[in-house]
């Protein structure tokens, strides 16, 4: 999206904070329904990040596939679970939580230090000359459509069959 610098930065910070709050909601809510809705917030924020990066097709696919299908399927399956009542008491920390937090923080610090110490501008991207010509003549959405109908036809159809089988299974569980 072509926005002025301060507005773009504000939207990045706003979406980043929404992403972090949604991720914390997924982890910290004891009710699985609330966690699933927080996951929906996270996926919507990721889709809005794609819009800010001028990748509108990926953003729409993110909304349709993940928020519209996967998150609804998660909520659907959680509603059909017949589990015990959720525990109302909340233990702040256990030993396992401390060890897990320590491992996650150390992985996060090592990832950030790796990102900061990598020379990203020294990478040379090589392409074939006909790929450059093809990218000039056809826009991104048309390229995705061409690749889905030629190169990735079989995996695309297999994924659609897997989703159909999972939907039929969910309907069979709902009928019982």
Curated annotation (Swiss-Prot):
Q: Which InterPro entries match?
A: NAD(P)H-Q_Oxidoreduct_6, NADH_UbQ/plastoQ_OxRdtase_su6, Nuo/plastoQ_OxRdtase_6_NuoJ
What Enzyme Commission number does this protein have? 7.1.1.-
**Gene3D superfamilies per the UniProt record, alphabetical:** NADH-ubiquinone/plastoquinone oxidoreductase chain 6, subunit NuoJ (1.20.120.1200)
Which cellular component appears as one GO term in the record?
chloroplast thylakoid membrane
What reactions does this protein catalyze? a plastoquinone + NADH + (n+1) H(+)(in) = a plastoquinol + NAD(+) + n H(+)(out); a plastoquinone + NADPH + (n+1) H(+)(in) = a plastoquinol + NADP(+) + n H(+)(out)
* Domain of life per record: Eukaryota
**Looking at the keywords, is Nucleotide-binding present?**
no
Instruction: State the annotated membrane topology for this chain.
Output: Multi-pass membrane protein
Q: Which family does it belong to?
A: Belongs to the complex I subunit 6 family.
Quaternary structure?
A: NDH is composed of at least 16 different subunits, 5 of which are encoded in the nucleus.
Q: Where in the cell is it found?
A: Plastid, Chloroplast thylakoid membrane
Which residues span the membrane?
10-30, 33-53, 63-83, 105-125, 152-172
Protein name as it appears in the record: NAD(P)H-quinone oxidoreductase subunit 6, chloroplastic
**Main role?**
NDH shuttles electrons from NAD(P)H:plastoquinone, via FMN and iron-sulfur (Fe-S) centers, to quinones in the photosynthetic chain and possibly in a chloroplast respiratory chain. The immediate electron acceptor for the enzyme in this species is believed to be plastoquinone. Couples the redox reaction to proton translocation, and thus conserves the redox energy in a proton gradient.
- What Pfam families does the record point to? Oxidored_q3
Under the GO molecular function aspect, what terms does this record hold?
NADH dehydrogenase (ubiquinone) activity; quinone binding
The UniProt keywords, alphabetically, are: Chloroplast, Membrane, NAD, NADP, Plastid, Plastoquinone, Quinone, Thylakoid, Translocase, Transmembrane, Transmembrane helix, Transport
